[in-house]
């Protein structure tokens, strides 16, 4: 854990095991607590007024994807696309990334510098807020009865199955998610139009007023288009979807105290993208009745 983790960066009811040095200096983000309250108030206002707004969470992988650099998750054949960058309309992603309403980025100085290189917009809030407000369940309980999810088909199916268990409902403080909107786990960027059709058709029948999303690099071309299909707040929370799936790396910001609930049925996890999850932290295995 960070040797000098400042109180400035503490958020109620969750623990941050992220060892980045930015959490040890006030200069990283002096208004962290003040802006956290602004962020929460903004979400409440947007949902209560049924405003349709998009939040794009930027990470270092998005930097490489938007530059068409074959690094990590942005490498063809790895996760986002099976084709080479010159075989897709990459410019649609570059242009789309600039068309969202709000932008979040971790307070890591290097990530914020990368953001400014590829997206000519202001960073509105730290991405850590999205993680923490799922980790401490605030967002789940504040918007109970209004929340849907958007993410990889395999993870949506895992969460659906987990939510059948009263024990998991109790842990989240939430009886159900209103909608599960699926997209391909791998290679969703190969055909942006096809992925949009898949997601759009599901959104047309949705009832949620706020969607928590984790959709990989396809978000750069897709997020700004979602408002065409339903009026809702679209909040990109990235790896927080993995937490709801029970497979979060607890060293991700603010998930240090998270319990990964999993189901004793291996077939549910076949082909799932575990990202950095290696089994650390607290786990509860739910048996099928």
Segment roles from a protein language model:
Residues 168-210:
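A mid-sequence, solvent-exposed acidic-amphipathic segment
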Residues 145-147, 208-211:
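Short active-site oxyanion
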Residues 213-216:
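Glycine-rich beta-strand-to-loop/alpha-helix junction loops that act as flexible
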Residues 218-289:
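C-terminal functional extensions of proteins
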Residues 55, 149, 176-182, 234:
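Conserved beta-strand scaffold positions in the cores of enzyme catalytic domains, especially
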Residues 2-173:
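Electropositive, gly/pro-rich neighborhoods at or near active sites that engage anionic ligands
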Residues 110, 185-187, 241:
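Residue-level detector of flexible, active-site-proximal loop/helix-junction positions
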Residues 66, 156-159, 188-190, 221, ...:
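Short acidic/glycine-rich loop or secondary-structure boundary segments that cap or lie
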